[in-house]
Amino acid sequence: MVLPKSRFETINGMEVHFTQWGDPQKPTVVCWHGLTRNGRDFDILARHLAQDYHILCPDTIGRGWSQWSSFPEKDYCFENYSNLAIGLLDHLGIEQARWVGTSMGGAIGIRIAGTPLHQNRITHLILNDIGAGASDNAVQDIEGIKRIISYVGTPPQFKTFIELKNYYKTIYATFGLSNEQEWNDFTQYSCRRRDDGGISPNYDPNIALQFQHTEDLNLWNQWEAIQSKILLIRGEISDVLPLDVAVKMQQKPNCQMVSIPKLGHAPALNTEEQISIIENFLR
């Protein structure tokens, strides 16, 4: 079985944790997680891809084992996350990479691939259930975005691991985790013990300040500038990537879209079918 290495590096003055899979001499795939999540969400996918690729799965600052910011109003935004991603690639001497981004991780990928200074850094861009903005109204009016805003700044507290796992089974029901072991792993890598002995999700509540940076949520200009090959994955019942936005994005000549039946925001990329779609696109 392929096992990851756990690494900590200082990038732009912040300590960033990431898991590293496979041979660094092979082509690199960066897997970047969603808003409150962490790099271990990609363990199943990374284990499969590591036969052919070098895989990096970072924890964004404020999540997982990466450092929490002392200046959250400034640091918790897509622009800074994009700069950290470029800084990590530079630090590791990686000129180009394939990119798999779930939700926020996809938005970061759009920013990088759609910025003239960096657009050659990403050759293949996979966006997992995230759009470039809204079609008509403000992004904040999208039902799934409103749902996320309602809870992200106040992570719940529980006494036991089981209670937290049951909570995750509720709010992440549409991810498509398929068995109890996957839920155990998902919860284990997403929790921390509190000073009072309780347990809670492992992220800085201040990451909710992201939503003060409303410009981060409108990425249409960057979207139009992307030259990379693009695969847009949409959960069939997603409330974060509306169908009309996905259809608009699919009109871009270098973008193809697939829909994952019965799943919402965001597919866990954990099944043979989903992994096969990704493997075929990355080739």
Task: Go through the PLM ranges and name each one.
Residues 263-273:
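Catalytic histidine-centered segment of alpha/beta-hydrolase-like enzymes
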Residues 44, 57-100, 104:
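Active-site loop/oxyanion-hole signature of alpha/beta-hydrolase fold enzymes
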